[in-house]
């Protein structure tokens, strides 16, 4: 773990961190932070059967607290940092919008990964062919002898990779339009950006 990532983890100590939506990105990311002794809350409108028994057991073993069901967002006013899932946008969800108005930090797994990733980032987006292009680039890097990781919109969380990545590695990220909507103001952009194509919807 690089010093920058260690400083990031240290900056989160003593803060209440909520993950809204416990899907393929947020559940592993919540577990990653909880394993470092941080105060993490898992929020989802669905029950534990959706998240998965094994995942829930792992989260609880690391001290993660749950807020599930109809009123799953009720704890948000108490949080310092809110990680939203890709499908929950600030301008569409009043609870998330109110968090921003109160001055709470609202972010996402991918935004935090971009901020603190020490590796070279290759970002791939577009209307079609994202997963194929992302996978091809990853396999080409591996074949050429580079150390690389793959994830993002194709169903793999990137934040846990911060544990082991170094400046000589590559992070190959598939990015959806929903992820990019709130990433425009980030100082840290991809080292290489790939746009497969753009179609109107």
Please name every model-derived segment.
Residues 1-108, 112:
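N-terminal leader/targeting and accessory segments in enzymes
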Residues 74-77, 90-201:
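Phosphate-binding loop of NTP-binding sites
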């Amino acid at each position: 773990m690089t010093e920058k990532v260690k400083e990031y983890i240290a900056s989160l100590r003593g803060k209440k961190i909520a993950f809204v939506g416990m899907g393929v990105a947020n559940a592993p990311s919540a577990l990653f932070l909880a394993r470092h002794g941080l105060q993490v809350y898992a929020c989802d409108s669905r029950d534990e059967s959706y998240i998965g028994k094994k995942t829930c057991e792992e989260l609880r073993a690391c001290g993660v607290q749950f807020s599930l069901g109809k009123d799953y967002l009720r704890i948000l006013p108490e949080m310092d940092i809110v990680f939203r899932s890709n499908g929950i946008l600030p301008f569409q969800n009043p609870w998330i919008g109110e968090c921003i108005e109160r001055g709470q930090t609202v972010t996402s797994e991918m935004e935090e990964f971009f901020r603190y990733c020490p590796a070279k980032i290759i970002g791939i987006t577009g209307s079609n062919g994202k997963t194929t292009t992302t996978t091809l680039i990853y396999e080409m890097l591996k074949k050429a002898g580079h150390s690389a990781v793959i994830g993002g919109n194709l169903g793999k969380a990137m934040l846990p990779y911060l544990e082991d990545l170094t400046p000589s590695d590559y992070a190959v990220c598939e990015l959806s339009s929903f992820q990019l909507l709130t990433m425009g103001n980030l100082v840290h952009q991809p080292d290489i950006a790939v746009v497969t194509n753009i179609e109107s919807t």
